[in-house]
A protein has these predicted regions:
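N-terminal "arm"/small-domain region of PLP-dependent enzymes with the aminotransferase-like
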Residues: 2-68, 199
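Active-site C-terminal subdomain of aminotransferase-like
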Residues: 197-200, 207, 212-318, 331
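Active-site phosphate-binding strand-loop segment of PLP-dependent enzymes
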Residues: 47, 147, 151-203
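PLP-dependent enzyme catalytic core of the Aspartate aminotransferase-like
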Residues: 55, 59, 63, 67, ...
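Conserved PLP-anchoring active-site segment centered on the Schiff-base-forming lysine
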Residues: 114-133, 154
């Protein structure tokens, strides 16, 4: 295998697609250090509410480990369920206004273990073309008939639903916020079509929960769809503290069946008590105040408006993801490298992560960013943008 992998790795490197991991030597926050001892402002983390280093969550994690131990050494159905796990599942269900919730090691596992457990070859899954890789992989593991519609294209979705009418069940699967463009799925229209064609609706809230909606409660709040979305999946690794862990929440019968049949749930260790305890505390914090969400919204609006005024081409967004369009792959790499020299940590994305000719810098805003952080990033964008001929 070595003889095969070595030239393939060389090809990846030659194509400029090799992924190098930058080493961070501080906690995850707005201002970080990366090796070799470089101070940068972080604009590429999923730390939307700025909770990754929150002292209250660290204290809660420490206390949970003191009372409930470091790890579970078991899957849930043997001896891996503590009272903390049930408390967190109840908090998730309460947050999303659903019947029940089930925890996974990651949202990748939640999506990977969803469809196979519920659907057969008599059923159909209709999936948005820009859905996350975990949904794509989950669909591949399932025997249901597969349909795909162009991103947020309701005409194509309706055509797929018409084609799938002979199937027993139809499930529409979509991200709430699409991670590369930052656009919010048109959930109101999706739910209308689901009702018209008798389909279930599943939405991955990984980039939308904690972010979109009047108080950050996600797409159901944004579009007033409580009771009309059947299945939510999501992560504890982004807005909700940034540690790890995923979940599925929805109707009781669906969650009960996942506990019986979902393979990543049945055959993976339970989430560690420290993460569970901190996550419970995080949901308490979000119940007490909307201040973090309000600050995030202010930061997004300020950054987007200033960047557009400077002449940058910004994808429309209602999320914390701001796509600065550069279109050329090499330009996106050069731009990101120059930004790091200016003390701003951003990432360039290009084919095959995004379509050819759609290269961009993806900026992720956080409630952890202060106004001076935003101003420094905007000034760096303008300086580098002028140097590289992106703006006048």
């Amino acid at each position: 295998m070595k003889e095969f992998l070595t030239p393939e790795l060389a090809d990846i490197q030659a194509a400029g697609l090799y992924k190098n991991e930058r080493i961070i030597t501080t906690e995850q926050r707005a201002a970080i250090k990366v090796r070799p001892d470089s101070d940068v402002l972080n604009f590429c983390a999923n730390n939307y509410l700025g909770l990754s280093n929150n002292p209250r969550l660290i204290t809660a994690a420490t206390e949970a480990m003191r009372t409930h131990g470091y790890g579970m050494s078991s899957v849930r159905f043997i001896c891996g369920t503590q009272d903390l796990h049930k408390e967190l599942e109840a908090a998730i269900a309460d947050y999303f206004h659903t019947d029940d919730a089930i925890l996974y090691g990651s949202c990748f596992d939640a999506n990977g273990g969803l469809f196979e457990a519920l659907l057969t070859d008599q059923d159909a899954i209709i999936s948005d073309a820009l859905n996350h890789a975990s949904i794509i992989d989950g669909v591949r593991l399932c025997k249901a008939k597969r349909y795909r519609y162009a991103n947020a294209d309701m005409t194509e979705l309706e055509n797929c639903l018409k084609e799938a009418q002979a199937q027993r069940f139809r499930v529409i699967a979509t991200d709430g916020v699409f991670s590369m463009d930052g656009n919010v799925a048109p959930m109101d229209k999706i739910c209308d079509l689901a009702e018209k064609y008798d389909a279930l609706v599943m939405v991955d809230e990984s980039h939308s929960a904690g972010v979109v909606g009047k108080t950050g409660h996600g797409v159901a709040e944004q579009f007033d769809l409580y009771g009309r979305i059947d299945i939510f999946t999501g992560t504890l690794g982004k807005a909700f503290g940034g540690a790890m862990g995923g979940f599925t929440t929805g109707r009781k019968e669906i969650i009960d069946m996942l506990r019986q049949r979902s393979r990543p749930y049945l055959f993976s260790n339970s989430i560690a008590p420290g993460i569970v305890g901190a996550s419970i505390e995080m949901f308490k914090m979000l119940k007490e105040s909307n201040a973090l969400h309000d600050k995030l919204v202010d930061n997004v609006n300020y950054f987007r408006d200033k960047m557009m005024a400077a002449g940058f081409d910004i994808k429309p967004t209602q999320s914390a993801i701001c796509a600065v369009m550069l279109y050329d792959a090499k330009l996106s790499q050069d731009f990101a490298a120059r930004m790091q020299e200016e003390g701003i940590y951003v990432t360039g994305f290009y084919y095959p992560v995004v379509p050819k000719g759609q290269a961009r810098i993806r900026v992720q805003l956080s409630a952890g960013h202060e106004r001076e952080h935003l101003d420094k990033a905007i000034a760096a964008f303008i300086k580098v943008g002028r140097e590289l001929g992106c703006i006048k």
